[in-house]
Amino acid sequence: MMSRGALAGLLVLGLTACASAKDTAPADPNLSCLLHQPATYIDSLKQLPAAIRAELLKTAGAMADRGEFFNAGDVVEKPAPFNRFIRGGAVGGYWFVWYEHGGIAYWHQIAIFALDPNGRAHVIANQTATQRDLCAATDELLK
């Protein structure tokens, strides 16, 4: 059984961690990087084709647009999504979307979509970015 002192210490430690998580701002991705292949870039969720946007929201869940508030940490400050659009674009017959995910762990996600001849969107790739350079990671997925 844990003593009152040890329990109080754990409580203080936990509250301190929660308070500091709120103050930790996620690192901004490099929005000036360019893919190695010709691409058209977009900076708003609203600029995605409707079918791609619908499939993204079905796959990822609710998402704030770039620059809008989202819950980046595990402390919910107000009702808002845990995902936020970063950047997207078209490369050949594919669309890429970068978004950030908050919560207990913060990460960047890269999703690649394609539209079939009937205009339906399909997820081609959807993975956590393991490197900081989202352009390089996207280039790898598009190979």
Where do the language-model regions lie?
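Generic "edge-of-domain/loop-turn" microfeature
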Residues: 104, 120, 130-132
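Exposed beta-strand-loop-beta-strand "reactive/processing" segments of non-cytosolic proteins
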Residues: 83-112
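Short loop/turn segments immediately following beta-strands, especially the blade-tip
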Residues: 115-121
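Bacterial N-terminal signal peptides
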Residues: 8-16
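Bacterial N-terminal signal peptides that target proteins for export
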Residues: 1-7
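Flexible low-complexity loop/turn motifs enriched in small/helix-breaking residues
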Residues: 18-93, 126-143
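Residue-level detector of beta-propeller blades
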Residues: 109, 122-124
